[in-house]
Amino acid sequence: MTTFTHTRFSAAILAVAIAVAALAWSAGGAAAAVQTVNGTVGPGFTITLTMHGKKVTKLKAGKYRCVISDRSSIHDFHLSGPGLDRVLTAVDFTGTTSSSLTLKKGSYHFQCDPHASFMHGAFRVG
């Protein structure tokens, strides 16, 4: 093998290795995309959790971005489940907030603490 042929062969192997690495990285990045769930509390006495416009009843375990729209200063949004117990919006807060969550397999419950007897919901992760 001449030096010129050896150099071309090495360059071709390097190009293929870079292409394979880039493809693996982009596929891993796409698979690891963080899903967004949307919570709403208020106006009135309503509390919801949706994904893609549909009520959340079951999710896969993993990382999520949780965007809460709190439309009333008399409510909070409290989420609890395996290894998680967080008040995502406080009673005096109105506006939108975002949190990163890691959900593990199990049952989850969300509620407005001051009105927990009738403002609540649940979903499963598994």
Tell me what each language-model feature is.
Residues 51-58:
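Short beta-strand segments of immunoglobulin-like
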Residues 13-24:
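Bacterial N-terminal signal peptides
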Residues 67, 76-80:
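Beta-strand signatures of extracellular beta-sandwich domains
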